[in-house]
């Protein structure tokens, strides 16, 4: 028995059709789309292993499968099918309400003003330290399920509110539990260098991460207790500056983790250049990236993960997406979901990318699919609808795919089904 057949779709957005593992430059202008019509729809078949087995017009596909049974069937008449969305940057494990900080920001407080006043990351760290694993897991579960309903089928999830070995491991264990119990797929990131713990210096914090936290993490990975793929550092003036960032990231890389870090968010401190030098897989934020940083990224394979929600809520200068795209940098997108930017929706993030970062809709969709997959090292299996890739899909009740971005906050209404590995994991009632 096959897992699924989708029939009669008006449009199927493949994104890629020739096995591309990244889209940048001119390739972003013409993403692959299979167009149907009122009289000739499109079918997608997912095999028993959760992978795409066939995509084609109904009249070509039906004869091949008329003797087949399917665990699920979707009538997508008048609808569009897109790849499952991929969120390239989130901080979803936390407790402690920070809604009061929103009023501070609206009154003119900067990110660092809030941080210095005892809010921000340190506020959340205090609450995470007091919480049990169960107390962290329940809100994480709710958030991830809401992301799934917004069309996200793969999400990057960071630790980073522990800032010591015990609590960073606690957060990573909670993420590991979510991987096993929830349908959404997760790429785990160790972010012990998210802030400098109170009473510590940057050097002391870096030494602790390198000599205690990373070895403990490696031991847990080797024991099969954790599956962590990436290492992150908040590379920022007054937090972990370039030299501390360098040694932490190198230690993580030496331990087998992919480099995927915060860079050049608030100040231009050459984070992009550092990432290119170290062979980073991805660098996030980049609001203050320099021209030299753009050049360095364009010459390397490092992906820029842009977070329009951050510029929006903090009223920051947005990252120079157009200059980066024009220079040949591959751009992915993320919600940056965290207590400072409470956004769970990749459709809204794509909308903001278009309006604030001046990206086109095809650029935004590539950033939320194939390029986001590449930022997590999964472009071989995720991020486009091609035979042999995982059948992760979003079915929307619209005849054109652009409605997923165009309708501001409209994803709750138009997302009809979310499919993960060929299984329907969400359907609108």
Curated annotation (Swiss-Prot):
- Output the GO biological process annotations, alphabetical, semicolon-separated: L-histidine catabolic process; L-histidine catabolic process to glutamate and formamide; L-histidine catabolic process to glutamate and formate
| Cellular compartments per GO CC | cytoplasm
Which GO molecular function, any one, fits this protein according to its record?
imidazolonepropionase activity
Residues reported to bind N-formimidoyl-L-glutamate: 161, 338
**UniProt keyword annotation of Mitochondrion present:** no
UniProt-listed Enzyme Commission number(s): 3.5.2.7
For this protein, the record's Pfam families field holds: Amidohydro_1
**What's in the keyword line of the UniProt record?**
Histidine metabolism, Hydrolase, Iron, Metal-binding, Zinc
Pathway per its UniProt entry is: Amino-acid degradation; L-histidine degradation into L-glutamate; N-formimidoyl-L-glutamate from L-histidine: step 3/3
* UniProt superkingdom: Eukaryota
- According to the record, how does the cofactor bind? Binds 1 zinc or iron ion per subunit.
* Binding-site residues for 4-imidazolone-5-propanoate, renumbered to this chain: 161, 194, 265
- Which residues are recorded as binding Fe(3+)? 262, 336
Q: Needs which cofactor?
A: Zn(2+); Fe(3+)
Q: Where is Zn(2+) annotated to bind? A: 262, 336
Its UniProt entry gives the catalysed reaction(s) as: 4-imidazolone-5-propanoate + H2O = N-formimidoyl-L-glutamate
- CDD domains hit by this protein: Imidazolone-5PH
As for family, the record states: Belongs to the metallo-dependent hydrolases superfamily. HutI family.
- PANTHER family for the chain: IMIDAZOLONEPROPIONASE, IMIDAZOLONEPROPIONASE-RELATED
- Protein name, UniProt field: Probable imidazolonepropionase
Task: Tell me which species this is from.
Answer: Nematostella vectensis (Starlet sea anemone)
């Amino acid at each position: 028995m096959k897992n699924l057949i989708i029939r009669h779709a008006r449009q199927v957005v493949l994104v890629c059709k020739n096995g591309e593992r990244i889209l940048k430059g001119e390739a972003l202008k013409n993403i692959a789309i299979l167009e149907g019509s009122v009289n000739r729809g499109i079918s997608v078949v997912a095999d028993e292993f959760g992978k795409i087995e066939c995509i084609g017009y109904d009249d070509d596909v039906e004869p091949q499968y008329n003797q087949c049974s399917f665990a699920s069937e979707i009538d997508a008449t008048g609808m569009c099918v897109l790849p499952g969305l991929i969120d390239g940057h989130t901080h979803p494990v936390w407790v402690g309400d920070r809604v009061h900080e929103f009023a501070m920001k609206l009154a003119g407080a900067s990110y660092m003003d809030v941080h210095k006043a005892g809010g921000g990351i340190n506020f959340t760290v205090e609450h995470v330290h007091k919480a049990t694993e169960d107390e962290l897991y329940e809100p994480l579960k709710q958030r991830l399920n809401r992301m799934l309903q917004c069309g996200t089928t793969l999400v990057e999830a960071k630790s980073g509110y522990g800032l010591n070995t015990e609590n960073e491991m606690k957060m990573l264990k909670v993420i590991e539990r979510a991987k096993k119990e929830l349908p959404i797929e997760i790429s785990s990131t160790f972010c012990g260098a998210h802030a400098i713990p109170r009473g510590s210096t940057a050097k002391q914090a870096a030494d602790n991460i390198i000599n205690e936290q990373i070895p403990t993490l490696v031991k847990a990975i080797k024991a099969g207790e954790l599956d962590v793929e990436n290492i992150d550092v908040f590379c920022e003036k007054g937090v972990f500056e370039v030299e501390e960032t360098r040694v932490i990231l190198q230690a993580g890389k030496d331990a087998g983790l992919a480099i995927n870090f915060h860079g050049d968010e608030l100040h231009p401190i050459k984070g992009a250049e550092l990432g290119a030098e170290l062979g980073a897989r991805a660098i996030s934020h980049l609001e203050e990236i320099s021209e030299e940083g753009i050049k360095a990224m364009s010459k390397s394979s490092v992906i820029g993960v842009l977070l329009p929600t951050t510029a929006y809520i903090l009223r920051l200068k947005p990252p120079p997406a157009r200059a980066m795209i024009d220079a040949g940098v591959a751009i992915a997108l993320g919600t940056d979901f965290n207590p400072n930017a409470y956004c769970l929706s990749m459709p809204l993030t794509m909308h903001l990318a278009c309006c604030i970062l001046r990206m086109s809709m095809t650029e935004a969709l590539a950033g939320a699919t194939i390029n986001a997959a590449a930022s997590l090292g999964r472009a071989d299996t995720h991020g486009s609808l091609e035979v042999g890739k995982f059948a992760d899909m979003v079915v929307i009740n619209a005849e054109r795919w652009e409605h997923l971005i165009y309708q501001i906050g409209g994803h709750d209404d138009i997302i009809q089904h979310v499919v993960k590995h060929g299984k329907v994991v969400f359907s609108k009632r």
